[in-house]
Amino acid sequence: MNPLTVIGFLGSTLDASKFGPTRWNKWRPTVSICMQEDLRVDRFVLLHGKQHQRLADIVMDDIRDVSPETEVSPQLLNFDDPWDFEEVYTKLLDFAQDFPFDPEVNDYLIHITTGTHVAQICLFLLTEARFLPGKLLQTQPRGGAPQPIGHWAQIALDLSRYDS
């Protein structure tokens, strides 16, 4: 099994909470990925804007607390307008082209639960076009009482299994 790298946006809403200990009672998708018993994350590339640096620092510290074996790599991506499709796609494409992907050695999951809808669509398109050579990762909270660990699903975009 190859080392696993997860790439995903900091959720400025979903990952946010009060900065005290009660944050551990809430599902935060980015942190919850690294709390999964059946998913070992070797590296987490956390995409975030400068305006969310404080939240990014807290989330990175929390990932290190729950998963000390996970290397957390912050990646600053600033958008003038995070809802501008062209800007978001272009900056994510630049990120993808500059990132040292090595799919022969590492596996990649692209987290699409956080970020604006525009960012989620762009991540999907870049993964589908293999600029991001991985599978999609989707997370969601568990039903019932609030708890920090949710569910996760891996989505492969290889549609050849549907060929007749």
Protein language model features and the residues they cover:
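Long, low-complexity, Lys/Arg-enriched
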Residues: 1-109, 116-164
